[in-house]
A protein has these predicted regions:
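Membrane-embedded alpha-helical transmembrane segments of multi-pass integral membrane proteins
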Residues: 18-28, 73-83, 103-110, 130-137
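Luminal/periplasmic active-site loops of membrane-embedded glycosylation enzymes
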Residues: 45-58
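Membrane-helix boundary connector in multi-pass membrane proteins
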Residues: 108-127
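Cytoplasmic juxtamembrane regions at transmembrane-helix boundaries
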Residues: 81-103
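Membrane-water interface at the C-terminal end of transmembrane alpha helices
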Residues: 132-148
Length: 148
């Protein structure tokens, strides 16, 4: 294995593990959205949408339902990312590289844009930027492998 392949392999594995970690976060979103894992996010959400008041029972049920389907979507999206990373991306197929960027950036722009529109900047900072950096770094670091 030459040095270039070692570098590529490192970043490809980072990409896989970052997405596996995000799958775990998606499961937490779906099944533990009111736990200490999301206390900061939930507190900021209350500040933005409820003037700092607690969720009443109806709002809490709506939030739990939304977190459930959002968590499921996160899990499904990142399972696809892992499968692409471990197969076509690893084989340096250009479509895989482009697809990962398209999926990541489409999610980031839509999710962050809506969050900003509604004043939920905390979602962009706490969740979206972390995921963008965590998954974007290995994509940036491997771009030269997909030039042909």
């Amino acid at each position: 294995m030459n040095k270039g392949n070692g570098k590529f392999n490192f970043w490809q594995k980072w990409l896989t593990y970052a997405n596996l970690m995000t799958i775990a976060v998606g499961l937490l979103v779906a099944f533990a959205g009111n736990s200490f894992f999301f206390e900061i996010h939930n507190n900021y959400t209350k500040d933005v949408f409820l003037n700092g008041n607690e969720f009443d029972q109806n709002i809490l049920e709506l939030k739990n339902w939304l977190f459930g389907i959002i968590g499921g979507t996160i899990v499904g999206f990142h399972i696809l990312m892992v499968m692409i990373s471990e197969n076509s991306f690893k084989k340096k197929e250009k479509w895989a590289y482009k697809t990962m960027w398209y999926g990541l950036l489409t999610w980031f722009i839509i999710d962050s844009g809506i969050s900003i529109y509604y004043g939920a900047i905390h979602n962009v900072i706490i969740i979206n930027l972390v995921a963008l950096v965590l998954i974007g770094i290995p994509l940036i670091m491997t771009k030269n492998e997909f030039k042909n």
